């Protein structure tokens, strides 16, 4: 089941991410990839960082689903699933949620790139933005 967030939702994610962190993850990526000498090396390094963060996010989202399904009383899981299905057009399946988040994250970061008139370093800019948004979600999940 593919999930497509609209521009409004993507921008909400973007606004949330930009207020949740004040540049700290970007600095962390810069220090992680500080030894790179070329744009290609930087792009590859940032891509690896993003892949690792997505693996960590997948585990965290699985834990959220596990916690929700074991909530006492059964009310929270119904409300949670209803919100995911009706409002966000996705499911309680963590893999579908991850895919939906990744698509919305990418859309928001590409849009932000166009707003900031970044002509060069598109991939690096977008990937750094995606890392910051992922870090913001992980912080929200308490991870």
Regions found by a protein language model. Name each.
Residues 24-143:
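N-terminal alpha-helical modules
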